[in-house]
Structures are given as structure tokens and as C-alpha cells.
Design a protein with these regions (language model features):
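Selective transmembrane helix interface/packing segments
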Residues: 2-191
């Protein structure tokens, strides 16, 4: 039996649990930043799940304007913990700068993926239940509307068809192609 027989399942569990919690913290940050409905059941779930560590962090890390900096600090700390744990179990050690940059890159990737999923899901929901209300569509609308509104300024409706979701998806994919490779390369150089 190889060593990976035991470490691979452990890596999977650590990565899965921390990734889910990181996603919850990121969604809470984004929904708070976008001004999403606080009493929405999804918002309430995210607040309750992420409140304990944020309550402690807020004593030391105050918000800056509309930006909840304690959520950002928690995101980076959790991602660094996840990356450090996984790399350590794989026998790879990085210096703190490379680890921080790797974690930042993964958070930017997650942010872009959250928006890609949100725009896509919001567009699908608008086709099947236009004007309908449910907790998920309200959250998705709050999250995507600022980005879609920006796209609508440049791309008007054509024959009643809104192409802003398509434009937003193209912009998000372009951002992935332009922003992420230099960050990954820099992390490789530092590490």
C-alpha cells in the first residue's frame, strides 16, 4: 500500500470541507457587498454559518466603508490553511509569500467562477420562470445585476432579447484568461 492510499482521502476531506466553508464566506461577503436581501433564507443560512469566526475577527479588523474586511481576512486565512494542509500532506512546502499568492489566486478563481455560475443560473431561471420569485433567484439577481447592468450600457436589447448575460460570461472568461495566468506564474516564481 502506498502512502497516497491514506493521504488522498484525507486531502479530499480537508479540501472539500474547507472549500465549502470558503464558498460560504465568499458568498456572504458578496451578498453583503451587493446589498442583497438580508432576510432571504439563503442569506440567513450564510450569516449563521459564517458568524462565529467573523464575530471574533471583527473585534480586530474593522470594515472599510462598504467592504467587510474581516470577511476578506477570513477568506485568505482559510484558503491559506487549506492550501498549506493539502501541500503539507503531499510533501510540498512553500514559503509564506508563495502560499499567500497561491491562495489569493485561488480566491480570484473562485470569485470568477461564482459569477460565471450566477450569471448562467440567473439567465436560465429567467427563461423558465420570468418574473417569478424564489429565494435563489432573488440572491442571483442581487449578485449579477450590477455586472449585467454594466453590460447593458454597451449592448442594447435586440428585438427584446437581452444579450447582457452572454456579454458578462464572455467578460468573465476573458478575465480568467488575462488575470489568472500571471498570478499563477508569479506564485511559481516565488515558491
Amino acid at each position: 500500500m502506498s502512502a497516497s492510499y491514506l493521504t488522498d482521502p484525507l486531502i479530499f476531506v480537508i479540501d472539500a470541507l474547507l472549500s465549502l466553508y470558503i464558498l460560504a464566506v465568499m458568498l456572504r461577503f458578496l451578498l453583503q457587498w451587493c446589498g442583497a436581501e438580508f432576510y432571504n433564507p439563503i442569506s440567513q443560512f450564510l450569516v449563521k454559518v459564517t458568524h462565529p469566526p467573523l464575530k471574533v475577527l471583527r473585534r480586530f479588523v474593522p470594515p472599510i466603508g462598504k467592504i467587510d474586511t474581516s470577511s476578506l481576512v477570513l477568506l485568505l486565512a482559510l484558503q491559506m490553511l487549506s492550501d498549506f494542509s493539502v501541500l503539507m500532506l503531499k510533501g510540498v512546502m512553500l514559503n509564506i509569500g508563495a502560499l499567500a499568492l497561491l491562495s489569493f489566486t485561488q480566491l480570484v478563481t473562485l470569485l470568477l467562477n461564482v459569477y460565471v455560475f450566477s450569471v448562467f443560473a440567473s439567465a436560465l431561471l429567467s427563461w423558465f420562470d420570468p418574473g417569478g420569485y424564489n429565494a435563489a433567484s432573488s440572491i442571483l439577481r442581487s449578485l449579477t445585476e450590477p455586472l449585467l447592468e454594466m453590460c447593458r450600457r454597451f449592448i442594447p436589447d435586440v428585438a427584446g432579447v437581452d444579450f447582457s448575460p452572454l456579454a458578462a460570461l464572455l467578460l468573465l472568461q476573458l478575465a480568467k484568461m488575462v488575470v489568472l495566468p500571471p498570478l499563477q506564474e508569479l506564485a511559481n516564481l516565488i515558491g
